[in-house]
Regions:
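A structural-propensity feature for long, helix-poor, extended segments
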Residues: 38-48, 52, 254-293, 486-496, ...
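Internal maturation/activation junctions in enzymes
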Residues: 201, 517-539, 543, 565-661, ...
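Active-site cavity-forming subdomains of large catalytic enzyme subunits
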Residues: 85, 91-132, 214-501, 507-509, ...
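Conserved oxyanion/phosphate-binding beta-strand-loop segments in alpha/beta enzyme cores
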Residues: 128-148, 176-209, 236, 712-721
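Catalytic alpha/beta core of large soluble enzyme barrels
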Residues: 118-126, 130-144, 430-431, 524, ...
Length: 750
């Protein structure tokens, strides 16, 4: 008699019927898969004392190897087999235990925040959980969930199952609601049905003691050593807790600039970016991956040429930053000079700092004044040659990322409180930031403290007038002896965004959008108050603007299932209709929340407060891409909504942004964000090897509508982006797919 060794170490007689039970369940109700084929091809070599783990892994691998374009459903077979294995690993039996047992175990392991379960009726929520929703997972989706999101004990073993995880996240995000039990169920339904998925930090950390839920941060560095090193500290803290970072360096003086009256003293921005690069490597994200930091400068900065060389493999290594993502913050004037084949002037920001504070016509006017000023040091370059260098690097390395300053700021709903200086790592978040401001702090021997601006004129007791930054402890003021002079910081603004994405493959009708969007907006708004903030400046900024970023994913799958060709007119019309509905319902939901919980503190004076919406920033060329009946027509009652917002306010200063969704789209088994598929079949590298993946719901009916990205006219991607952008107050992470034959010098010269 053959025996089998269970996970517990216990030995029992081998029972083939138990194996058949699991294999039968794994193929149930799936087309074009075969139980006999699975069992025969597994070729399990039964022997005495074979382990159940070995049997299970053999079956899983057999199913995975069968995934192909003509039989995509094998991914669900593999997922079910993996889940059966996971149930046993977590619970010791096939299925779910009680929600209370899950919480007790998680608290004991120190992985679930104490007290959360005490705020709810666990018996009620346990009965609400629908374990059948596990059947939605593809194999790569459930593997991603297991490897990246499920809580583990100190040995690295999973201690939660998917539906418990989704319910715990929902409970965490609903805990401050007056009727938290009901809202937990609504949040759970959205997440567990794969209708809306929060971003990775929320999935990973909501329910845990270290509940850092935000995806990305955006900051700015001032032009002084205190501010530069405070930026290093801030970036380190943000990276430590898993945030992606976008950071503006445009204010830092160029190489060869003056410092304290000394010529050629400044080393420029590059040495500081080298330190930033080392921070990204040294301060990894909770040990899971290296930090991810995008660094931005404007194209008039004198260090622009060296900046574009940051990722080159040749040259002086001390001036290379292979782990950073260089990004350009481009103004319209630069693009006009390229079109005109004109000259472009480079400045040291120490001489022209207000260029960072201006955009549009005001920037153009000031920039041209500096060009004409003979007292301002400057360098000249042909705009087209600089642009050619940008594109050469772009084609060779994928960087610099390109973002457009004037467009971002013209659409900024909160331009009354500042300026957008850069975007984030993934170039979809556009919010106001402000570098720290430093003042001179004079501490007297009697304990009195006085603050001065650095260039403020101060008259000492001996009658000498000095700049405040030149005051020392040898001076006396008003008969008082100075103990020490140091710099004090007035913190600026570091923007933060909390993201979630609507799965368009499941939510694409007016009825579903109207149902789903208000729940998603409330869920994201709750993230703001429940978040762990790594830095006080980040929390203060987020509470002032209450920024969220509701986006979409699964666009390509939705189009394929509805037999709509990518980039055709029907595509533009469909996405225009959907994005309008999302925009309308998101704005309405935020206004309703404002009525219930209060408007964001910076609402007064915003474009929202004046009834100005994202659609009002759309240009006529974009509007003409889709015929809405005349030049432009409405599907929703926008005028009524404008009046409502002016009257009731907005809960969130920033509302919509389309993120890349690289991990969460895999988790829910749909196509990434707004992008076409790269291929109809490809392989994803995983810890367990290469996993075959096919486009979602691939069939003879959808095959022709899954056009690979590299086969498309890339202008179609830009047109689709323009249609979406009409309805978005922030931005969208948009990729362009270029093959090597289209990135040659010939095309650059053309």
């Amino acid at each position: 008699m053959l025996t089998v060794i269970k996970r517990s170490g216990r030995t029992e007689p081998l029972d083939i019927s138990k194996i058949k039970k699991y294999t039968s369940e794994s193929v149930k109700d799936l087309d074009n898969v075969s139980l006999s084929e699975l069992e025969v091809d597994a070729k399990i070599q039964f022997r005495d004392q074979i382990t159940t783990t070995e049997i299970q892994q053999t079956l899983i691998k057999t199913a995975v190897d069968k995934i192909d374009v003509d039989r995509p459903n094998w991914t669900f077979v593999a997922a079910r087999l993996f889940l059966y294995d996971l149930y046993h690993r977590v619970n010791g039996f096939s299925g779910y235990g009680h929600l209370r047992d899950y919480f007790n175990r998680g608290e004991k392991e120190g992985r679930i925040v104490l007290g959360l379960k005490d705020k709810y009726d666990l018996d009620d929520l346990n009965s609400y959980i629908d374990v059948r929703r596990d059947l939605q997972f593809t194999y790569l989706g459930v593997k991603t969930l297991h490897d990246r999101y499920l809580l583990k004990n100190r040995k690295g073993e999973p201690i939660e199952l998917p539906q418990h995880m989704f319910m715990a996240i929902a409970m965490f995000l609903a805990q401050n609601e007056l009727n938290s039990q009901d809202w937990a169920k609504k949040f759970y339904d959205l997440i567990s049905k794969f209708e809306v998925m929060p971003a990775t930090p929320t999935l990973s950390n909501a329910r845990t003691p270290r509940h850092q839920l935000s995806s990305c941060y955006i900051g700015s560095t001032p032009d002084n050593i205190e501010g530069i090193f405070d930026s290093f500290k801030e970036m380190s803290l943000l990276s430590k807790y898993g945030g992606g970072i976008g950071w503006d360096w445009s204010l830092v003086r160029a190489m060869g600039g003056m410092i304290d009256g000394h010529k050629n003293a400044a080393g420029g921005v590059i040495p500081f970016l080298k330190i930033t690069n080392d921070i990204a490597v040294a301060v990894d994200q909770l040990g899971t991956r290296k930090g991810a930091i995008a660094v931005y400068i404007e194209p008039w900065h004198m260090d622009i040429s060296d900046f574009l060389d940051l990722k080159k493999n040749s040259g002086e290594e001390r001036r290379r930053t292979h782990e950073l993502f260089p990004s350009l913050w481009i103004n319209d004037l630069f693009m006009k000079r390229i079109e005109q084949d004109a000259m472009w002037t480079l400045f040291d920001p120490a001489d022209t700092p207000d260029l960072c504070e201006l955009y549009g016509e005001e920037f153009d006017k000031r920039y041209e004044e500096y060009e004409k000023n003979p007292n301002i040091p400057k360098e000249f370059v042909k705009a087209k040659e600089l642009w050619k260098k940008v594109l050469t690097n772009y084609f060779e390395s994928g960087s610099p990322f390109l973002c457009f300053k004037d467009n971002a700021n013209r659409a900024n709903p909160n331009n009354h409180t500042g300026i957008i200086r850069s975007s984030n790592l993934c170039t979809e978040i556009f919010q106001n930031t402000q570098p720290n401001h430093y003042v001179i702090k004079v501490v007297f021997n009697n304990g009195e403290v006085r603050l001065f601006e650095e260039d403020e004129d101060i008259k000492t007791d001996d009658g000498i007038v000095k700049k405040a930054k030149k005051i020392t402890a040898l001076d006396t003021l008003d008969g008082k002896t100075i103990f020490i002079v140091e710099k004090d910081v007035k913190e600026g603004k570091t923007a933060v965004c909390n993201l979630a994405s609507i799965n368009l493959s499941k939510v694409n009708t007016q009825e579903d959008i109207k149902r789903v969007v208000p729940i998603a907006v409330r869920m994201l708004d709750n993230v703001i108050d429940l978040n762990f903030y790594p830095h006080s400046k980040v929390k203060r900024t987020n509470l002032l603007s209450r920024s969220i970023g509701l986006g979409v994913m699964g666009e390509a799958q939705m189009l394929a299932e509805q037999s709509i060709a990518w980039g055709g007119y029907d595509h533009l019309a469909k996405i225009d209709e959907i994005m309008e509905a999302i925009s309308y319902n998101a704005i309405k939901a935020s206004s309703n929340l404002s009525l219930e919980k209060g408007a964001y503190p910076e609402f007064e004076g915003s474009k929202w407060s004046k009834g100005i919406f994202p659609i009002d920033a759309a240009n006529e060329n974009t509007k003409r891409l889709v015929d809405r009946g005349g030049l432009f027509g409405y599907t929703h009652d926008w005028e009524k909504l404008r009046e409502k917002v002016k009257k009731d306010g907005m809960r969130n200063g920033y509302l919509m942004a389309i993120a890349p969704t690289s991990s969460i789209s895999i988790l829910v088994g749909t196509t990434q964000t707004i992008e076409p598929v790269y291929k109809r079949k490809w392989f994803e590298e995983n810890l367990s090897g290469m996993i075959p993946v096919t486009a979602p719901k691939l069939s003879p009916d959808t095959w022709g509508f899954y056009t690979p990205a590299y086969e498309l006219d890339q202008k179609l991607l830009i047109q689709a982006g323009a249609v979406r952008q009409k309805w978005i107050d922030q931005g969208q992470s948009l990729n362009i797919f270029i093959t090597l034959d289209k990135a040659s010098g010939k095309y650059l010269n053309d």
